[in-house]
Amino acid sequence: MKMKKLAVFFAAAALTTVTAAGCSGGQKETAADAAKDSEAVTTAEQTTGAKTEVPETTAEAAEAAAEADEENYDTGDASKDNARNQDGIGENELLVVSFGTSYNDSRRLTIGAIEDAVEKAFPDFAVRRGFTSQIIIDHVKSRDNVAIDNVGEALDRAEKNGVRNLVIQPTHLMNGLEYTDLVNEAAEYSDAFDKVAIGKPLLTTEDDFRAVRKAVTETTAQYDDGKTAICFMGHGTEAESNQVYEKMQDMLTEAGYKNYYVGTVEAAPSLDDVLAAVEEGSYKKVVLEPLMIVAGDHANNDMAGDEEGSWKTAFEDAGYEVTCLVNGLGQLEAIQQLFVEHAQAAVDSLTK
């Protein structure tokens, strides 16, 4: 029985091929402890030679299934998106890992744009893609005949192509369970490469929060007329890491953005919480925008949908004029560059 050790540094997790055990820590593209710049975590993990698949949680599966069921409108041309599943990788690979989305245009404009930015920044690395949602992968394959690697397939591809130095950069919003799953799965391959480093998620340090605050306030500045409430919808989680939404709210308020509100679909602050907070003001208009990397099912339906229960209809029923901005954070150049910075820290850690 082999035991492996995986050291995870949130500033830039450097993984070396040594003997001992796996890893742990966080939740999907939904929540994170405001992690320390540098933290090592280890966990014992048995391996039998076969690579294991990380199952989706019930919530993740439900989200992916809901997205896969949305066939009432065109989500864009899948052929315009680069699945980045080619061989001929070379010795250096930068694997960008995302939950994924079956919304073709959003996938290209968010995840694809992040991958493009990373590719431009690291010409000595071949950039490849891995999704964590098998349901989305299967749906895109069935509907559009586009093959996207899951994380295990992407790691297998890297190993078969003789990659020696592997950097994994997640596009997760926060350090949560899905980030932990990624670290654990990468641990199973720690003896397949000379060096492995895992970059940190979007919201990890104080500087990250400030950078995201700056990005989202700048992109909504045209609506900030003093008469409009600007509300961001995150995913949310019941895990402790859900506190990052409160942290983002506090940072917005402290910076003087008192008409900016942060809520979630799955946890607190809820839609009711955000609506109640907005009603304490004297606003006539409301702008809704997702606080998510992609604009998928949650953004198009839970936020901007016309059916009862959506954020849009709830605010309209309360008498507000509502504008929905169905854009993922990944479309913003500032967010793309923040992921590049995180990837740079991971790349730099390979030589330490």
Where are these regions (language model features)?
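Bacterial Sec-dependent N-terminal signal peptides
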Residues: 1-10
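C-terminal motif of bacterial Sec signal peptides marking the signal peptidase cleavage site
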Residues: 18-22
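Active-site-proximal alpha-helix that buttresses catalytic centers in soluble enzyme cores
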Residues: 25, 29-30, 48-352
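Pyridoxal 5′-phosphate
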Residues: 33
